[in-house]
From Swiss-Prot:
Gene giving rise to this polypeptide: rbfA
A GO-annotated cellular component: cytosol
Record region (Disordered): 1-22
Function comment: One of several proteins that assist in the late maturation steps of the functional core of the 30S ribosomal subunit. Associates with free 30S ribosomal subunits (but not with 30S subunits that are part of 70S ribosomes or polysomes). Required for efficient processing of 16S rRNA. May interact with the 5'-terminal helix region of 16S rRNA.
Protein name, as recorded: Ribosome-binding factor A
HAMAP family the record matches: RbfA (MF_00003)
Subunit field text: Monomer. Binds 30S ribosomal subunits, but not 50S ribosomal subunits or 70S ribosomes.
Length: 136
């Protein structure tokens, strides 16, 4: 008995990565959040005059949850802003509802994007004289 579903995927087995729809919705949410952070003056005192960039948004398979990876421009202390971002998440979600063409708008969760910090640490290590000597 063949239990293959659409596109030959076996029923009951998780896909190896996000679907095209998850990727498309994630990119649309990322674009809209980035625009909101650029154009909105938040009343929360912790977010006044703070520049935040949204580097990636991952959407759950059921499209009900969005994890937004954020970085603070020019600084690496984005973790201190996570409570403030959690407070403004319902406002951001309501703004997303006007632009997303989905039955339901995903709940937004914020995580710090540490990829840039990690890349800078690796770069600093590679520039150390003893490491550079070994690489030559």
């Amino acid at each position: 008995m063949n239990t293959a579903g659409p596109a030959g995927k076996l029923a009951g087995h998780a896909a190896s990565g996000p679907t095209q729809r998850q990727l498309r919705v994630g990119e649309e949410v990322r674009r809209m959040l980035a625009d909101l952070f650029a154009r909105t003056e938040f009343r929360d005192p912790e977010l006044v005059d703070v520049r935040i960039t949204v580097t990636e948004v991952r959407i759950s398979p059921d499209l009900k949850h969005a994890t937004a990876f954020v970085a603070r421009l020019g600084r690496s202390d984005v973790e201190t802003l996570l409570p403030a971002l959690k407070r403004v998440a319902p406002f951001l979600r309501s703004r997303l509802s006007t632009g997303l063409r989905l039955r339901g708008v995903p709940e937004i969760h914020f995580q710090p994007d540490t990829a840039l910090d990690y890349a800078m640490e690796v770069d600093a290590l590679l520039r150390q004289p003893d490491v550079a000597r070994d690489l030559d």
